[in-house]
Amino acid sequence: MFVCSLCKVQCVCFEKLASSIENQSDTSSSLRRIQRFISLYSLDKDLIARLIFALLPNDPPYSIAIDRTNWKFGESNINILVLAIVYQGVSFPILFKLMPKRGNSHTSERIEIMERYIKLFGRETLEYLVADREFVGEEWMQYLNFNRIEYHIRIRDNFWIRNPKNDKQFKV
């Protein structure tokens, strides 16, 4: 009920969530229940991912995007690796990994989030992966190729590409 209210209200304001819950209780009672729930319960991230996946209006396979966001909150660095399903130009974050450091993700972190997606939803639900230019590297590309994951990755203008058919290199 709580997660459905989050989707309905599209915010995390407890008062708005409480007023959106359709039941016989008073809004203040719903608010206290939400506060108790948040303070006592640890949400299962995989369960939330499955719920979001089930609520998507279209059937798989899906395009997925991987991205990273980094900002400072006071003295704390917040760095999150996100895997999202892209549907009609909108990205729905489905999996994330908090990274205890600043800067780009490592290949192992990317593989971990991809493996989690495949474990939860299956490889067949993935049409292709979209990523920005920070998501490159030989080991990462080998992982994607080995697992037959089609990808569209922006690359830097100073990159050299090797054509596997004739082994010739050319600058992008």
Predicted regions and their residues:
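Short secondary-structure transition/capping motifs
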Residues: 6, 23, 37-41, 71-72, ...
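An internal, acidic/charged active-site-proximal segment
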Residues: 96-172
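Short, charge-rich amphipathic segments
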Residues: 15-17, 37-51, 70-80, 159, ...
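Short, conserved catalytic/metal-binding motifs centered on acidic residues
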Residues: 17, 63-70, 83, 91, ...
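RNase H-like nuclease fold core
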Residues: 27-29, 54, 59-121
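Electropositive nucleic-acid engagement tracts
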Residues: 1-60
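Solvent-exposed, charged interface segments at domain starts and junctions
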Residues: 1-16, 76, 110-111, 116, ...
